From Swiss-Prot:
Functional summary from the UniProt entry: Binds as a heterodimer with protein bS6 to the central domain of the 16S rRNA, where it helps stabilize the platform of the 30S subunit.
InterPro entries in UniProt: Ribosomal_bS18, Ribosomal_bS18_CS, Ribosomal_bS18_sf
Gene: rpsR
Protein name: Small ribosomal subunit protein bS18
Molecular-function GO terms, alphabetical: small ribosomal subunit rRNA binding; structural constituent of ribosome
Pfam families listed in its UniProt record: Ribosomal_S18
Family the UniProt entry places it in: Belongs to the bacterial ribosomal protein bS18 family.
Species of the source: Borrelia garinii subsp. bavariensis (strain ATCC BAA-2496 / DSM 23469 / PBi)
Subunit structure: Part of the 30S ribosomal subunit. Forms a tight heterodimer with protein bS6.
NCBIfam families: S18
Gene3D superfamilies: Ribosomal protein S18
Amino acid sequence: MYKDRDVNQRDSRFENQQDGFKKNSNFRFFKRKSCKFCDSGKHPDYKDFDFLKKFITEQGKILPKRITGTSAKHQRRLALEVKRARYMALLPFVKK
C-alpha cells in the first residue's frame, strides 16, 4: 500500500517549510497597548462622560479591550460605568 512512496520523500505541502514552521515575512510585531487606567491610577467613573466617550464607537457601542488596550479588570469596570452613564442619560444608547 505504501511501498510505492519513498519514506524519505516529503509531502509537497511541506517543501517550502523548515522543520514544520514557515517563515512569514509579512508578520509584524505589535507593541502591547498599556492600560490607561493602570498607568494613571485613574478609575473609570460614570460622571466623567467626556473621558468615557473615548471608549465608545460613533454608533455608541463599547470598544473591545483589544482596541482600547485596557486590562480585563478595567474593561469590566469601564463597561459598567458606560452603562451607568447611559442610564443617567449622560451618554446616548445609540447615536444617529
